[in-house]
A protein has these predicted regions:
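A short, acidic, amphipathic alpha-helical segment used as a generic capping/interface helix at domain edges
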Residues: 187-204, 217
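Non-catalytic positions within long, well-ordered alpha-helices that form the structural scaffold/packing
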Residues: 84, 125, 199-201
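N-terminal active-site wall of soluble small-molecule enzyme domains
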Residues: 74-79, 97-104, 108
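Glycine-rich, highly charged phosphate/nucleotide-binding loops
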Residues: 66-79, 186-194
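N-terminal glycine-rich anion-binding loop in soluble enzyme alpha/beta folds
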Residues: 2-73, 140-182
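Short, acidic/small-residue loops that bind anionic groups at enzyme active sites
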Residues: 104-128, 223-240
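C-terminal functional extensions of proteins
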Residues: 215-217, 231-253
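Gly/Ser/Thr-rich loops at beta-strand to alpha-helix junctions
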Residues: 90-102, 114-120, 139-143, 211-217, ...
């Protein structure tokens, strides 16, 4: 830390609990999945302009996440506590369907928790005119139900238009079937096709939200194609980081 006169400040630091490393403000709970996580993905460290700390939730598969398996919660809580014990200031996840555990986990940890990209929906609604819709591109349209959304305080789906990738060949084989490889060009084409279809059907769409944590690499393409604001996991994580790690401003007048 450097003061304005460019002389090093004298500071005394104290160790915290049993930590052996420091400076990772955002903790990320990862699914137990063999999918390749490319730059831009939530599970790729090069996606961030700041250090993050990852923790795999053993046994928490993609199918369990999308299927709403409540039995995985003890493993999720154990992994989250490890992140907390290692000094993170806020905890997120790498699947929008982790929203099922949002309220319980934040209460049990007593710290900021933001597991799902879908938490941005109320914020986006306030940004755009009331007569405009939010387009959501998700890993599973079938599972993005009103009861599920109610778990994070979204009372109804009015104003939300949804397109699912569960039947898109590359997404299905790479993500849902976990074949162990991913063709990013094919994946991007599938995401852009869904975005284009949504916009064609709903010309009153005012913003797009990419639910799945694997989709941020394609967000710029979606924005370029549609001309709309695009939200995803990375917009949410960057936003929360800016709240839990405050910037010291410097300049002149």
């Amino acid at each position: 830390m450097w003061p304005l006169d460019n002389k090093r400040e004298s500071m005394i630091y104290q160790r915290k609990n049993n930590q052996v490393s420091y400076g990772e403000a955002i903790g990320i709970l990862l699914l137990d999945s063999p999918v390749p996580f490319i730059p831009g993905d939530v599970a790729n460290a090069t996606s961030y302009a700041f250090p993050v700390r990852f923790k795999k939730v053993v046994g928490f598969s993609v199918k369990k996440a999308i299927g709403g398996d409540k039995g995985i919660y003890p493993a999720l809580l154990c992994a989250a506590r490890d992140l907390k014990d290692n000094g993170v200031r806020a905890i997120t996840g790498d699947c929008g369907f982790m929203a099922l555990h949002q309220n319980r986990l934040k209460k049990d940890l007593n710290m900021p928790v933001f597991l799902s990209s879908l938490l941005q929906i109320p914020f986006i609604r306030q940004l755009i005119p009331e007569n405009q819709k939010i387009g959501i591109i998700t890993a599973s349209q079938r599972n993005l139900t009103e009861p599920f959304l109610e778990t994070i305080g979204i009372k109804e789906k009015n104003g939300l238009v949804v397109a699912g990738l569960e039947n898109s060949p590359e997404f299905k084989s790479a993500v849902l079937d976990e074949k162990g490889s991913l063709d990013s060009k094919k994946m991007e084409a599938e995401v852009l096709e869904k975005a284009g279809t949504l916009l064609k059907k709903h010309k009153d769409m005012g913003a797009i939200l990419l639910e799945c944590s694997l989709l941020p690499p394609y967000a710029k393409g979606v924005a370029d194609k549609t001309g709309l604001p695009v939200f995803d996991y990375m917009t949410m994580i960057d936003f929360v980081f800016s709240a839990v790690v405050k910037k010291k401003y410097r300049g002149y007048m």
